[in-house]
C-alpha cells in the first residue's frame, strides 16, 4: 500500500475531484518545504477523476443498489482518472455464467470488465468513496438479486432484547368491583448470528361482590419460541422451534420442528414483487420512460438495439404500463403493456423454496388424531410472460399431499392462476383420496378505475383432506370430520370515483360436505375527502345458516366523519384537534359516538374525549384518556363512565436492549433488531432517524432496513458549542434482528484559533495538517497562509501534532487554564511554538 504525507491525502479530494483537463498545479504553492528535490508528479491531479493510486475503502453499488463495503486497489487509467482493480472472484455470481471468464484472472482491471460486459460501466467518486458498477439486466447473475453481499452483513453483538406492554383496569359497579392485569413481552437473545425469540404473557383477574371474596386468579405462558440463523450464500434462513408452514397452495399450519426457507427480505427490493419485463427496440441511443397511472416510475437510457427492462418496482397488483421511447433525433414512439399480477407471481429468474420437518402443533386442540412426523416442501420460480410455476407436498405416515400450480399474465385480460392438489389420508383405517382445485384472477382497468384485486374459487371433493382436517381433533365437535370444506368463493373489488372517493366491495361464501351449513360475508364501503373533511360509510353482513348451526344474520351499518377543529373556529389552533362523529347500527341497536382528539400543547401527549349514546337503556357513556408517546416510554391513562360502572384503565409500553457493558431503552419495538447510537454518555443528542440519546448516552434506532446499507446521522445543528463531532454520519449493513452499536466520538472542549510558529519564528507552512494528540486524528485542521488553524472540542491542556512534506513534523504543548472564557461560544486565540 502506498503511503503519502497527510497534506497530499487531503488534496486528493480537494484537487482531484474538481480538476479539469489541462489544469496544472505549481508544487511550490502547496507547502514551502515540498520542493523540487521531492520530485512530486502532480500531473495526475490535472485530469478529471485523477488522484494518487493505492488502496482505498469504498462502497460498491451495482445498478444504483448497494452491494458491499470493500478495500480495492486503484490505478490511473488511460484517461488519467483513478480506476478500481477488482480481486479474483469479485464478479463470481454477480455476472451471468457466459460473462464470468474474467474471474479466472488474478486481478481484474476496469478495462477487463468493460471489454467483456457490453454496455457495462464503472465510475469512481472520490469525494464519497463510492464505486458504481452498471451491468445490463441480461448479464446479471444470482448474487445481483440480493440487497447486498452476505459478507458485508453485520451480525451485531451479543444482546438481550425486550419489548414489553403492561396494562390493567379497575371496574367499580353496583355491588362490587373487579381488577385485571395483563403483561406481555417479546423476548430475544442474540449470539454469534443466532437469534432466539419467544413471547410470554401473564394475566390475572379478581372480583369482589356479595358472593365472591376476591381471590386472584392468574396464568403465565410462553409461546412462539424459535431459534434462527441466516445462511447468506443460500439466500435462506434456518429456523427451529414453534413454527408455521408457508402455505403456498392450501392453508398453512403450525408445527414444532425446523425449516429452512428462501428469505425474500434478502432480495433486492425491485425483485421482491412481480414486475413484468418491458421489451422493445431502440433505433438509436434513446430514453425509455415507463408510466403507470400517469406517474413516471422509471426513466432509463438504453443503447441502440433490443432492450429488456425489469429493474423497477410497482405498487399494487395491476395497472397498464405506458412505455415511451424517445430517440436521439427527438422522434418518439410508444406502446402500452398491460399489467396484472397475483401474490404468487415472481420476477423472471427468481426462485423460492421451503423445507420443513416436524410434528403438527395446534394449541387450540387438546389432542390430535395422528402425531407422526411430517415433511413439507414447496418451490416456486418465475419465468417469462408472467408465468410462475409452484408446487408443494406433505409426506407423513398416514397422510400424503401433492399440489402444483401456475400463474399466467393474460395481457389486457388481467392475470390468472390455477392449482390442483391430490391428497391421500388413512383415517380410522379407511383410505380417503380426493382432489382440490383453485382459481384466482386479478385485473385493473385504468380508464374506469376498476380493480379486481382478487377473485378466488376453490372446490374440494368429498374425500379431500387438508393436513389441518386430517390431524386436528376436537371432541366437542364430532361432526367436524364430515364437515370439510366443499367450495369457497371470494371477491375483492375496488372502484375509483375520482373526486368522489372510492368504493370497495369484499364478499365471500363457503359451504361444506354432508351439511347444509353455509357461511356468507359481505362488506361494502365508500370513503372520500373534501377540503380536509373526511367521510366514510359502510355496510356489512355476516350470515350463518344450516342444520348444525343456529341461523345468525348480523347486519352492521356505519357512518364516520371527521373535521379539523380549525375549520370550525375559523383559525389555526395549537392542539391540532379533530372532531369526529361515528354512528353504527348493529341489527336493531344504534350507537352514536362524538369524539374530540388532539395534542396537548408543549408536550408529547395526546388527549381524547368521547361521549356515546344509544337507543337502549343505560347505554350512554363518557370517556377521557391521555396518551404519552415518548422517546423512552409510551403510556396511557383513561377513565370511562357507563351507567353505574366506573372504569379506570392504564398501559405502559417500551423496549430495552442489554448488550456488553451498556443499556439502551426506548419506546419502539426492538425485537426485529436495532442500531444503538452511543455518544460517550452524553445525553440530548438528536438522531435524524428518530429519537435522542438518554442519560445513558444511548439512543435506539429501529428504522433500519436489514441486509442493506443504512445511514445514521446525528443532528449537529442543535448541539452545544463546546461539543465537537468529527463524523456525524455512519453506515451499517445489519442482519435482520441484529443489534449493532454505532459509536460516535464526541469531544467536549473549547473553540480555539491556534497561531503556530516553528522554533525559528516562521509560521508553519501553508497546508500543514494539525491534529490533537490522543484524538485518533479526528480533531484535525489545516494551517492557513498566516500559520493559523481553527480547532473545536479542545480540552484545557494537551499536545498538538503538526505535519507537512515528507517526514516533516513538530509538536506543541498548550495549557488554556490561563485563558478564561465567559461562555462556550467564545473563540479563544492561542499562540504556540511547534518544536
UniProtKB/Swiss-Prot annotation:
GO molecular function: fimbrial usher porin activity
Location, primary (coarse class): membrane
Compartmental location: Cell outer membrane
PANTHER family in the record: FIMBRIAL USHER DOMAIN-CONTAINING PROTEIN YDET-RELATED, OUTER MEMBRANE USHER PROTEIN
Membrane topology: Multi-pass membrane protein
Functional note: Involved in the export and assembly of the 987P fimbriae subunits across the outer membrane.
Keyword annotations from UniProtKB, A to Z: Cell outer membrane, Disulfide bond, Fimbrium biogenesis, Membrane, Signal, Transmembrane, Transmembrane beta strand, Transport
TM region positions: none
Signal peptide: 1-21
Protein's recorded name: Outer membrane usher protein FasD
Domain of life from the UniProt record: Bacteria
UniProt cross-references to SUPFAM superfamilies, sorted A to Z: FimD N-terminal domain-like
Positions of disulphide bridges: 810-834
InterPro entries: Fimb_usher, Fimbrial_membr_usher_CS, FimD_plug_dom, PapC-like_C, PapC-like_C_sf, PapC_N, PapC_N_sf
Similarity remark: Belongs to the fimbrial export usher family.
Gene: fasD
Cellular component terms (Gene Ontology): cell outer membrane
GO biological process: pilus assembly
Amino acid at each position: 500500500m502506498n503511503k503519502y504525507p497527510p497534506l497530499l491525502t487531503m488534496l486528493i479530494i480537494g484537487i482531484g475531484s474538481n480538476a479539469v483537463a489541462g489544469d496544472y498545479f505549481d508544487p511550490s504553492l502547496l507547502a514551502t518545504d515540498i520542493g523540487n528535490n521531492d520530485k512530486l508528479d502532480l500531473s495526475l491531479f490535472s485530469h478529471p477523476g485523477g488522484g494518487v493510486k493505492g488502496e482505498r475503502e469504498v462502497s460498491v453499488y451495482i445498478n444504483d443498489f448497494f452491494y458491499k463495503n470493500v478495500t480495492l486497489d486503484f490505478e490511473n487509467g488511460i484517461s488519467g482518472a483513478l480506476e478500481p482493480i477488482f480481486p479474483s472472484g469479485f464478479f463470481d455470481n454477480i455476472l451471468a455464467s457466459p460473462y464470468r471468464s474474467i474471474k479466472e484472472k488474478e486481478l481484474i482491471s476496469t478495462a477487463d470488465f468493460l471489454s467483456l460486459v457490453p454496455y457495462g460501466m464503472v465510475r469512481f467518486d472520490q469525494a464519497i468513496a463510492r464505486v458504481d458498477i452498471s451491468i445490463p439486466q441480461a448479464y446479471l447473475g444470482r448474487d445481483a438479486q440480493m440487497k447486498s453481499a452476505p459478507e458485508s452483513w453485520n451480525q451485531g453483538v451479543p444482546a438481550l432484547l425486550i419489548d414489553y406492554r403492561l396494562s390493567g383496569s379497575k371496574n367499580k359497579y353496583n355491588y362490587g368491583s373487579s381488577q385485571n392485569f395483563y403483561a406481555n413481552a417479546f423476548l430475544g437473545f442474540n449470539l454469534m448470528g443466532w437469534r432466539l425469540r419467544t413471547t410470554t404473557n401473564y394475566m390475572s383477574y379478581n372480583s369482589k361482590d356479595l358472593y365472591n371474596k376476591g381471590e386472584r386468579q392468574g396464568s403465565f405462558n410462553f409461546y412462539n419460541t424459535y431459534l434462527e440463523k441466516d445462511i447468506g450464500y443460500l439466500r435462506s434462513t434456518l429456523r427451529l422451534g414453534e413454527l408455521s408452514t408457508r402455505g403456498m397452495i392450501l392453508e398453512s399450519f403450525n408445527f414444532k420442528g425446523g425449516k429452512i426457507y428462501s428469505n425474500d427480505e434478502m432480495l433486492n427490493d425491485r425483485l421482491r414483487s412481480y414486475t413484468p419485463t418491458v421489451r422493445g427496440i431502440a433505433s438509436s441511443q434513446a430514453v425509455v420512460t415507463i408510466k403507470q397511472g400517469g406517474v413516471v416510475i422509471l426513466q432509463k437510457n438504453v443503447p441502440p438495439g433490443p432492450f429488456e427492462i425489469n429493474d423497477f418496482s410497482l405498487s399494487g397488483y395491476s395497472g397498464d404500463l405506458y412505455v415511451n421511447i424517445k430517440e436521439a433525433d427527438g422522434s418518439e414512439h410508444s406502446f402500452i403493456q398491460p399489467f396484472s399480477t397475483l401474490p404468487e407471481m415472481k420476477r423472471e429468474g427468481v426462485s423460492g423454496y421451503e423445507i420443513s420437518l416436524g410434528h403438527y402443533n395446534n394449541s387450540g386442540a387438546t389432542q390430535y388424531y395422528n402425531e407422526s412426523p411430517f415433511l413439507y416442501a414447496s418451490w416456486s420460480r418465475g419465468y417469462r410472460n408472467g408465468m410462475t410455476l409452484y408446487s408443494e407436498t406433505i409426506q407423513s405416515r398416514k397422510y400424503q399431499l401433492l399440489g402444483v400450480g401456475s400463474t399466467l399474465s393474460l395481457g389486457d385480460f388481467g392475470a390468472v392462476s390455477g392449482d390442483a392438489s391430490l391428497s391421500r389420508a388413512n383415517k380410522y383405517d379407511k383410505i380417503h383420496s380426493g382432489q382440490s382445485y383453485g382459481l384466482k384472477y386479478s385485473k385493473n382497468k385504468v380508464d374506469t378505475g376498476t380493480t379486481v384485486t382478487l377473485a378466488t374459487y376453490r372446490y374440494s371433493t368429498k374425500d379431500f383432506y387438508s393436513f389441518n382436517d386430517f390431524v386436528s381433533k376436537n371432541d366437542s365437535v364430532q361432526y367436524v370430520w364430515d364437515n370439510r370444506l366443499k367450495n369457497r368463493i371470494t371477491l375483492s373489488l375496488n372502484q375509483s370515483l375520482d373526486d368522489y372517493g372510492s368504493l370497495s366491495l369484499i364478499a365471500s361464501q363457503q359451504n361444506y360436505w354432508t351439511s347444509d351449513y353455509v357461511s356468507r360475508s359481505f362488506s361494502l364501503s365508500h370513503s372520500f375527502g373534501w377540503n380536509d373533511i373526511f367521510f366514510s360509510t359502510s355496510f356489512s353482513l355476516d350470515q350463518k345458516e344450516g342444520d348444525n348451526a343456529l341461523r345468525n344474520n348480523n347486519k352492521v351499518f356505519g357512518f364516520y366523519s371527521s373535521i379539523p377543529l380549525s375549520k370550525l373556529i375559523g383559525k389555526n389552533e395549537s392542539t391540532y384537534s379533530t372532531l369526529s362523529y361515528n354512528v353504527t347500527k348493529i341489527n336493531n341497536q344504534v350507537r352514536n359516538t362524538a369524539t374530540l382528539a388532539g395534542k396537548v400543547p408543549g408536550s408529547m401527549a395526546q388527549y381524547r374525549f368521547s361521549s356515546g349514546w344509544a337507543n337502549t337503556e343505560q347505554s350512554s357513556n363518557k370517556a377521557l384518556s391521555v396518551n404519552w408517546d415518548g422517546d423512552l416510554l409510551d403510556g396511557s391513562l383513561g377513565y370511562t363512565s357507563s351507567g353505574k360502572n366506573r372504569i379506570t384503565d392504564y398501559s405502559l409500553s417500551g423496549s430495552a436492549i442489554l448488550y456488553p457493558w451498556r443499556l439502551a431503552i426506548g419506546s419502539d419495538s426492538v425485537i426485529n433488531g436495532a442500531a444503538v447510537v452511543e455518544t460517550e454518555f452524553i445525553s440530548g443528542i438528536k438522531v435524524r432517524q428518530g429519537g435522542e440519546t438518554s442519560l445513558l448516552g444511548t439512543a435506539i434506532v429501529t428504522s433500519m432496513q436489514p441486509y442493506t446499507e443504512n445511514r445514521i446521522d446525528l443532528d449537529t445543528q442543535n448541539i452545544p458549542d463546546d461539543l465537537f463531532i468529527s463524523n456525524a454520519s455512519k453506515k451499517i449493513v445489519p442482519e435482520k434482528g441484529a443489534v449493532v452499536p454505532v459509536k460516535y466520538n464526541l469531544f467536549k472542549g473549547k473553540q480555539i484559533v491556534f497561531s503556530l510558529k516553528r522554533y525559528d519564528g516562521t509560521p508553519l507552512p501553508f497546508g500543514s495538517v494539525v491534529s490533537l494528540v490522543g484524538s485518533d486524528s479526528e480533531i484535525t485542521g489545516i494551517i492557513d497562509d498566516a500559520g493559523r488553524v481553527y480547532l473545536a472540542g479542545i480540552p484545557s491542556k494537551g499536545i498538538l501534532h503538526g505535519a507537512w512534506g515528507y517526514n516533516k513534523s513538530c509538536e506543541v504543548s498548550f495549557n488554556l487554564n490561563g485563558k478564561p472564557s465567559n461562555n462556550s461560544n467564545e473563540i479563544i486565540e492561542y499562540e504556540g511554538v511547534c518544536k
